[in-house]
């Protein structure tokens, strides 16, 4: 679990290191607030994604299942600044094995609530679904704005990073890949 006391001390030390007074009125409760926030935004470190996966048998369904625009918030592990965006998650069931739609969003949420790289997050989502459901294919696309590019360094607000992970038929079959990418990119 997260050591909130250690976080509080570290935040207090950071405030002092940047020349602030951690005992002034506006900052007095900041270490506690940050510790509670970290417990929430890093909850995925202590949650097994396999615990939320529930598989249903739907023998008649053999077409692409896509959930688009799943909101995600994660923390870039390089600067501990947020990246915020959406995930599009699609898969093609094998032998009618399907996940509940909300489970796709839960998988995204759990894996995003860790210090992350967008590239790794995209792959972890795809690999988790491949392992859990053994579908014919999985496609995951994430579009996100990284505050480490917005607030510091290059300072380019609005720049979006797009990553994709394709598994199974979506990687090997051009026609299937084109179909799923067309669905993901459609504006409707």
UniProtKB/Swiss-Prot annotation:
GO terms for biological process: one-carbon metabolic process; tetrahydrobiopterin biosynthetic process; tetrahydrofolate biosynthetic process. InterPro entries: GTP-CH-I_C/QueF, GTP-CH-I_N, GTP_CycHdrlase_I, GTP_CycHdrlase_I_CS, GTP_CycHdrlase_I_dom. HAMAP family: FolE. It is an enzyme of class 3 (hydrolase). The gene is folE. One of its GO terms (molecular function) is zinc ion binding. Its EC number is 3.5.4.16. Belongs to the GTP cyclohydrolase I family. Zn(2+) binds at residues 76, 79, 148. Pathway: Cofactor biosynthesis; 7,8-dihydroneopterin triphosphate biosynthesis; 7,8-dihydroneopterin triphosphate from GTP: step 1/1. Keywords: GTP-binding, Hydrolase, Metal-binding, Nucleotide-binding, One-carbon metabolism, Zinc. GO terms for cellular component: cytoplasm. It catalyses: GTP + H2O = 7,8-dihydroneopterin 3'-triphosphate + formate + H(+). Pfam families: GTP_cyclohydroI. This is GTP cyclohydrolase 1. The keyword Ligase does not apply.
